[in-house]
């Protein structure tokens, strides 16, 4: 911030120069005016002396006229080049008052409407944080400086979760949803923070948030993981396995969290077997759809993908010994 204030001070000096230079010029004009008045007084004194000398008979009329003319020439020579003083309509105190008010008002208005805090935050974020607490403090200052930034609030909520401050994270994610809209990812983060803030007690609020998130996006990973955790804590191991399997299918093959997630699935399967249950494996059917050459010629790479969902056929009766089915 030092370089900023130096630049601001330089601009302020330039602005003050426009106010103070006329005042300095006015003082110079005043000195010229005083000099002119002195010359006039000397001229009048010289003329008076000549008049006294004529009255005493020392000078005749011609000599008097010559003396007056010489004194007048001297007066003109002394006052030559002196500009006529211009009277200021603003008065002398006003420029000094303006020179005082301009910097004061400039600083006050900048501190109120300016963005010095944002400039300082930009400088801070250009340097790597020394700790997680340092990063959280920076994000808190950023959220205070930009309370309408949904992105800043989102990262602040994630930082709170990393520090096990789930109650604070839940409040921040609620504000984020209010600003950015009810996006599935934000709803999932809010539900997760609220669940841990409630000491891992499943509540209708958390259920509503996860339901809404998965309705908008059935692949929303935070909600799937949270539902799996809640099912495992509630000893509903088959549900936990199902949710975590759905989550596992969304993770990239190189994702490091796949190992931990698979360990959770195996742990849930062991618990299910220990309680006398069996792990239900869902049947997966792979369907390959191929287009004819004529159909391929009419398609483009940007065309939408068609999803096929198989449905069980139910018998409706027999005709000629053959069973009839309907969907």
From Swiss-Prot:
<keyword id="KW-1003">Cell membrane</keyword>
<dbReference type="GO" id="GO:0017004">
    <property type="term" value="P:cytochrome complex assembly"/>
</dbReference>
<dbReference type="InterPro" id="IPR019734">
    <property type="entry name" value="TPR_rpt"/>
</dbReference>
<feature type="repeat" description="TPR 2">
    <location>
        <begin position="221"/>
        <end position="254"/>
    </location>
</feature>
<keyword id="KW-0812">Transmembrane</keyword>
<dbReference type="Pfam" id="PF23914">
    <property type="entry name" value="TPR_CcmH_CycH"/>
</dbReference>
<comment type="similarity">
    <text>Belongs to the CycH family.</text>
</comment>
<keyword id="KW-0997">Cell inner membrane</keyword>
<keyword id="KW-0201">Cytochrome c-type biogenesis</keyword>
<dbReference type="InterPro" id="IPR056413">
    <property type="entry name" value="TPR_CcmH_CycH"/>
</dbReference>
<keyword id="KW-1133">Transmembrane helix</keyword>
<feature type="repeat" description="TPR 1">
    <location>
        <begin position="150"/>
        <end position="183"/>
    </location>
</feature>
<dbReference type="InterPro" id="IPR017560">
    <property type="entry name" value="Cyt_c_biogenesis_CcmI"/>
</dbReference>
<keyword id="KW-0677">Repeat</keyword>
<keyword id="KW-0472">Membrane</keyword>
<dbReference type="GO" id="GO:0005886">
    <property type="term" value="C:plasma membrane"/>
</dbReference>
<feature type="transmembrane region" description="Helical">
    <location>
        <begin position="4"/>
        <end position="24"/>
    </location>
</feature>
<comment type="function">
    <text>Required for the biogenesis of c-type cytochromes. Possible subunit of a heme lyase.</text>
</comment>
<dbReference type="InterPro" id="IPR011990">
    <property type="entry name" value="TPR-like_helical_dom_sf"/>
</dbReference>
<protein>
    <recommendedName>
        <fullName>Cytochrome c-type biogenesis protein CycH</fullName>
    </recommendedName>
</protein>
<dbReference type="InterPro" id="IPR051263">
    <property type="entry name" value="C-type_cytochrome_biogenesis"/>
</dbReference>
<feature type="transmembrane region" description="Helical">
    <location>
        <begin position="94"/>
        <end position="114"/>
    </location>
</feature>
<keyword id="KW-0802">TPR repeat</keyword>
């Amino acid at each position: 911030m030092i370089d900023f204030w130096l630049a601001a001070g330089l601009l302020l000096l330039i602005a003050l120069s426009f106010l103070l230079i006329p005042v300095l010029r006015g003082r110079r004009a005043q000195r010229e005016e005083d000099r002119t008045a002195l010359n006039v007084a000397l001229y009048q004194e010289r003329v008076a002396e000549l008049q006294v000398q004529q009255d005493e008979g020392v000078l005749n009329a011609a000599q008097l006229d010559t003396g007056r003319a010489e004194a007048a020439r001297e007066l003109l020579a002394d006052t030559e080049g002196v500009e006529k003083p211009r009277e200021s309509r603003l008065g002398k105190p006003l420029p000094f008052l303006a020179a005082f008010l301009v910097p004061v008002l400039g600083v006050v208005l900048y501190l109120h409407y300016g963005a010095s805090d944002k400039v300082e935050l930009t400088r801070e974020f250009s340097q790597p944080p020394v700790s997680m607490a340092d990063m959280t403090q920076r994000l808190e200052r950023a959220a205070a400086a930009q309370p309408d930034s949904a992105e800043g609030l989102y990262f602040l909520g994630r930082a709170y979760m990393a520090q096990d401050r789930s109650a604070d994270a839940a409040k921040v994610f609620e504000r984020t949803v209010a600003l950015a809209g009810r996006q599935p990812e934000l709803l999932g983060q809010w539900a997760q923070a609220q669940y841990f803030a409630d000491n891992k007690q499943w509540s209708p609020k958390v259920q509503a948030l996860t339901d809404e998130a998965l309705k908008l996006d059935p692949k929303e990973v935070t909600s799937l993981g949270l539902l799996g955790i809640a099912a495992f804590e509630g000893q509903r191991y088959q549900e936990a396995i199902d949710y975590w399997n759905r989550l596992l299918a969304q993770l990239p093959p190189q994702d490091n969290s796949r190992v931990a997630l698979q360990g959770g699935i195996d742990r849930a399967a062991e618990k299910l077997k220990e309680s006398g249950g069996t792990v239900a494996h869902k049947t997966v059917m792979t369907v390959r759809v191929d287009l004819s050459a004529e159909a391929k010629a009419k398609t483009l790479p940007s065309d939408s993908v068609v999803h096929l969902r198989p449905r069980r056929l139910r018998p409706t009766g027999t005709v000629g010994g053959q069973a009839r089915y309907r969907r």
